Amino acid sequence: MTEGTVKRGDIFYADLSPVVGSEQGGTRPVLIVQNDTGNRHSPTVIAAAITSQTGKARLPTHINIAGGSVGLSKDSIILLEQIRTIDKRRLREHMGRLDEKQMHEVEDAIAVSFGLPGGNRGMQ
């Protein structure tokens, strides 16, 4: 992975191992949620794990992504409660990019995850 080529909204395969406990691990898709200034200048990125296990409990921090879109072969869920900082060297293949509408959904789910104003995806 070449530094400086990562953009907010990009989806990459990333190696998230090793993990502890309930963290998402292995080589899996991740969504880059860090701002582009950080993406350009930092050796790390902030990313959210993506799973194809669509039978998981539906949370207001989950965003559904249809298989066949943005480089994902299966229906998947972006897990905005599973956000972590990773070194860019963990990034592998670039898969695709979310559109503006999808990123607005992501931003709302992040607000829910972090308890920020505007997070209104079903949480009280």
Residue ranges and their predicted role:
Residues 1-124:
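Conserved functional hotspots at enzyme active or ligand-binding sites that engage polyanionic ligands
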